[in-house]
């Protein structure tokens, strides 16, 4: 069984307006996933330092970041990052450039975990519905160009308020939705903005949102997770 999760950490800023990366790491340790896609993991302005300092990740968790190395002291690309549990092999990684007017993007990592090679995509999509559909098509086209038969897990903040429409329709036919439940707003979750999709070779065993007291305070989103097996 492989557990994956996605979490928009809002640059470490909690619902109490306190910026506490230690609290984000506590929540990640509570979720205890093998692979985590993060959104808003870097500050947006200035040098765009990571909202989760690298030395803090090393000292207080069992994770290491996929080294996208877009900027010194940044964790990812436009705030998109992937953490993997130590012992998981990172085979390849890259940035996916998306059509966007605002700073949005996606990242991809090919990994080997528990004897299985997988492709992991983390993404944070646009506020515009038209642009979101373009971005999902772009992500799917780019990963299909990279060995379409590799089992794939796509995770992130899709910013899609529709329950079934909008950009979600772009996944139909190629991917299954892990029904994780509403993740936004963390104080009173009503919208499924954060999603996990898997390709056909992956079986979804269970899925949900992580709703601990600390998670409700650490960000305005709750983490979503799924436990998976491979056929």
State the predicted function of each range.
Residues 1-35, 43, 59-60, 64-231:
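Active-site regions of metal-assisted phosphoester/phosphodiester hydrolases
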Residues 45-51:
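Short, flexible/disordered intra-domain loops and linkers
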Residues 55-57:
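A short, gly/pro- and small-residue-rich
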